[in-house]
Amino acid sequence: MHEIYLAGGCFWGVEEYFSRVPGVTDAVSGYANGRGETTKYELINQTGHAETVHVTYDAKQISLKEILLHYFRIINPTSKNKQGNDVGTQYRTGVYYTDDKDLEVINQVFDEVAKKYDQPLAVEKENLKNFVVAEDYHQDYLKKNPNGYCHINVNQAAYPVIDASKYPKPSDEELKKTLSPEEYAVTQENQTERAFSNRYWDKFESGIYVDIATGEPLFSSKDKFESGCGWPSFTQPISPDVVTYKEDKSYNMTRMEVRSRVGDSHLGHVFTDGPQDKGGLRYCINSLSIRFIPKDQMEEKGYAYLLDYVD
């Protein structure tokens, strides 16, 4: 088993989140990297310890990079001594490691995350100096108190983390060579294909749909439904991390445009008339923006890590 120590604000939510991540074998709340080897909850603002979760994981099931991508999903990495409504040095963010070999991956992830922000990261990156296991009543707090305070959305643990660095965007020159003129017009020039005459509007085989420009996974067949609009429709992306949103006021309408995270491809729009039992959203997506990978080809094409997220 491997381990990493993660400070991300109030440890109740961080512990609960990581306890739900496949491949994590244990998550224990405690206090790390303060002054001295002893402390308790009432004293951590004096002893300088940070509320921290000791995450133990099976490296055969989940990598350190994936653990860190989960971590950065749930924190504000530019906020110093504050996460959610919690303020104080005990709520600072930090990644504390016990194996120097992990530092290469940690540095890589920090560098990738830093590029997304104008402000410097406020996340500590240090050897673990000390760790004090928190009092019993803090352990599994949200399991024992399901309506207890939590500053993060622990339900996001159900979604896969998708490593953006695996799917770099080709140059415009390369895209013009690899995409058809119609695919280029839709993804790069914000055009829209015709309804009911596109390749995926009535396709419901098991598999995933990836960005036609980069190959980044975007949608799963398990979230696809027949909406009657004539375009592929989904209740949600395969992960909330892989799409971005932009207000679109073209054609004298106000709509919410959906774009891919890495490729910045125009995908379509999201509307609020989807199935109510699935959240009420309808992602109306151009077939020309995506490529379908059948379930039986996912392993061959490098998407085996998403097989559990396909029906």
Swiss-Prot record:
Domain of life: Bacteria
Record's keyword terms, sorted: Multifunctional enzyme, Oxidoreductase
A Pfam family reported for this protein in Swiss-Prot or TrEMBL: SelR
Active-site residue numbers: C10, C284 (nucleophile)
Peptide methionine sulfoxide reductase A, as annotated region: 1-155
Top-level enzyme category: oxidoreductase
Residues in MsrB domain copies: 172-295
SUPFAM superfamilies, per the entry: Mss4-like, Peptide methionine sulfoxide reductase
GO biological process: protein modification process; protein repair; response to oxidative stress
Entry GO terms, CC: cytoplasm
One Gene Ontology molecular-function label: L-methionine:thioredoxin-disulfide S-oxidoreductase activity
EC number: 1.8.4.11, 1.8.4.12
UniProt keyword Oxidoreductase, yes or no: yes
Catalyses which reaction(s): L-methionyl-[protein] + [thioredoxin]-disulfide + H2O = L-methionyl-(S)-S-oxide-[protein] + [thioredoxin]-dithiol; [thioredoxin]-disulfide + L-methionine + H2O = L-methionine (S)-S-oxide + [thioredoxin]-dithiol; L-methionyl-[protein] + [thioredoxin]-disulfide + H2O = L-methionyl-(R)-S-oxide-[protein] + [thioredoxin]-dithiol
Cited InterPro entries: Met_Sox_Rdtase_MsrA_dom (IPR002569), Met_Sox_Rdtase_MsrA_sf (IPR036509), Met_Sox_Rdtase_MsrB (IPR028427), Met_Sox_Rdtase_MsrB_dom (IPR002579), Mss4-like_sf (IPR011057)
Family: In the N-terminal section; belongs to the MsrA Met sulfoxide reductase family. In the C-terminal section; belongs to the MsrB Met sulfoxide reductase family.
NCBIfam families: msrA, peptide-methionine (R)-S-oxide reductase MsrB
Function in brief: Has an important function as a repair enzyme for proteins that have been inactivated by oxidation. Catalyzes the reversible oxidation-reduction of methionine sulfoxide in proteins to methionine.
UniProt name for this protein: Peptide methionine sulfoxide reductase MsrA/MsrB 2
